[in-house]
Design a protein with these regions (language model features):
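Replace the tail clause
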Residues: 1-181
Length: 181
């Protein structure tokens, strides 16, 4: 409320700028985004730059030995894995960056399944691991994690053609159907 009272004109001008940019976007058929200085930037170029920067960031953060991103505690980070599969598709799955993205995602998913994050008895995946090797799970399972991780495993199966990833997705679905519904 204080910002509205103190900076109302600035907020209204910002809103007007957004509306004008959306109008230009709609008028141009969505083919171009508008850069801050007004020069049109093709959307595929802007998306490519964003994916490239994101890919570099996650490549540097990736734990090549144990999979995942960063140290303990380690979470599945389904959105990062999803980003890596999208990045591979955008860059080309047969290119070096595409293969690197698939490799980071697949290594992470494989290490998660081999470690204590996957519950081989009850099915599904625990929320996170308290150690960097994925050995010691935090004994809690969340429905939303099951959904996101299952999608990651399905995409991994499609990208790598390794049946184990599809099997793990089915394991998650069976756990959810049996214990969480």
């Amino acid at each position: 409320a204080g910002h509205w009272r103190d900076q109302r004109e600035k907020i209204e001008q910002g809103a007007e700028n957004v509306v004008q940019a959306l109008r230009r976007y709609a008028t141009e058929g969505g083919a171009h985004a508008v850069a801050p200085e007004g020069a049109p930037v093709p959307l595929h170029e802007a998306a490519g730059e964003a994916f490239e920067k994101g890919f570099q960031y996650f490549h540097e953060a990736h734990d090549a030995r144990w999979g995942g991103f960063g140290g303990a505690p380690k979470f599945p980070r389904a959105s990062i894995i999803d980003f890596l599969f999208r990045s591979a598709a955008l860059q080309g799955v047969d290119t070096d960056p595409g293969q690197a993205a698939i490799g980071m995602a697949a290594t992470t998913l494989q290490r998660m399944a081999e470690g204590g994050l996957h519950d081989p008895i009850g099915g599904g995946f625990h929320r996170y691991s308290v150690d960097e090797q994925w050995h010691v799970p935090h004994f809690e399972k969340m429905l939303y994690d099951q959904a996101l991780v299952a999608l990651n495993y399905l995409e991994a199966q499609q990208a790598t053609r390794l049946p184990v990833f599809g099997w793990l997705a089915r394991d998650i679905f069976a756990y959810v159907a049996r214990d969480l519904t």
